[in-house]
């Protein structure tokens, strides 16, 4: 399979290049300027449309502005597109949805298999303990731009869907006020080189249930992204998420 990795020189992008190469795929990279990642050639952004001529799938872990531009080109060429970029506004998400009308687009906030399991456990826990207070803490490296993380927002969406109501999301706390009954606390930490950690706390009278996922390496995200690309390559135009591949 011919795979184009957009953001090939980034933290996760370079891991995706390595993972896809080790699986025997033909890999080309895209970045701001021409370079290489190991034995894989990385082309400047302006050459991306030409790479689509022979591509079976694109994997993109960059920033919303770049992803939006590249997915439009891929849609025009009919090349399936895997998106790990987070932090899109409503207009950005609408653009991705529009692209999915012309090609297969798979977007996920997290490509770790363990996170998919966590989401199912979160649903079960929230359903079983409907009166418990809920707090979410997420930690990432000091270079991560969006907060809360895309994974944190996905977890919170699962909580809302399971509770069948939109809880008030309180981002951090200060001052003096009582915790609301329909409130979920959201706490963000950015420090060092932490790959990603998410903890959902369900607290009742005299007991606490803590649900945690911790990524030990970015390779887990890379493996999931390549899994997604392999699965997506033969799909028809439409909108998909990582859960569809499980």
Curated annotation (Swiss-Prot):
Pathway terms, separated by semicolons: Amino-acid biosynthesis; L-lysine biosynthesis via DAP pathway; (S)-tetrahydrodipicolinate from L-aspartate: step 4/4
UniProt xrefs under InterPro entries: DapB_C, DapB_N, DapB_N_CS, DHDPR_bac, NAD(P)-bd_dom_sf
Assigned protein family: Belongs to the DapB family.
Full protein name: 4-hydroxy-tetrahydrodipicolinate reductase
Chief location of this protein within or outside the cell: cytoplasm
Active site positions: 140, 144
List of residues binding NAD(+): 7-12, 84-86, 108-111
SUPFAM superfamilies according to UniProt: Glyceraldehyde-3-phosphate dehydrogenase-like, C-terminal domain (SSF55347), NAD(P)-binding Rossmann-fold domains (SSF51735)
EC number(s) given by UniProt: 1.17.1.8
Phylogenetic classification of the source organism: Archaea, Methanobacteriati, Methanobacteriota, Stenosarchaea group, Halobacteria
EC class of the enzyme, as a word: oxidoreductase
Reaction it catalyzes: (S)-2,3,4,5-tetrahydrodipicolinate + NAD(+) + H2O = (2S,4S)-4-hydroxy-2,3,4,5-tetrahydrodipicolinate + NADH + H(+); (S)-2,3,4,5-tetrahydrodipicolinate + NADP(+) + H2O = (2S,4S)-4-hydroxy-2,3,4,5-tetrahydrodipicolinate + NADPH + H(+)
Keyword set, alphabetical order: Amino-acid biosynthesis, Cytoplasm, Diaminopimelate biosynthesis, Lysine biosynthesis, NAD, NADP, Oxidoreductase
């Amino acid at each position: 399979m011919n795979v184009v990795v957009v953001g090939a020189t980034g933290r996760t992008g370079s891991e995706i290049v390595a993972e896809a190469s080790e699986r025997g795929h033909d890999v080309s990279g895209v970045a701001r300027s021409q370079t290489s990642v190991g034995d894989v050639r990385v082309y400047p952004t302006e050459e991306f449309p030409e790479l689509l001529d022979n591509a079976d799938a694109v994997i993109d872990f960059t920033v919303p502005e770049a992803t939006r531009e590249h997915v439009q080109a891929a849609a025009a060429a009919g090349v399936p597109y895997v998106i790990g970029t987070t932090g899109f506004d409503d207009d950005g998400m609408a653009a991705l949805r529009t692209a999915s009308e012309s090609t297969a687009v798979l977007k996920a906030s997290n490509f770790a298999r363990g996170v998919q399991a966590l989401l199912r456990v979160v649903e079960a826990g929230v359903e079983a303990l409907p009166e418990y207070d809920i707090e979410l803490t997420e930690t990432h490296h000091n270079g991560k731009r969006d907060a809360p993380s895309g994974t944190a927002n996905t977890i919170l969406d699962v909580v809302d869907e399971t509770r069948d109501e939109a809880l008030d999301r309180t981002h951090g706390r200060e001052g003096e006020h009582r915790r609301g009954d329909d409130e979920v606390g959201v706490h963000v930490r950015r420090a060092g080189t932490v790959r990603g950690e998410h903890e959902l706390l369900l607290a009742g009278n005299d007991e606490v249930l803590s649900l945690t996922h911790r990524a030990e390496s970015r390779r887990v995200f890379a493996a999931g992204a390549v899994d997604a690309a392999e699965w997506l390559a033969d799909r028809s135009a439409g909108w998909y998420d990582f859960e569809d591949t499980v």
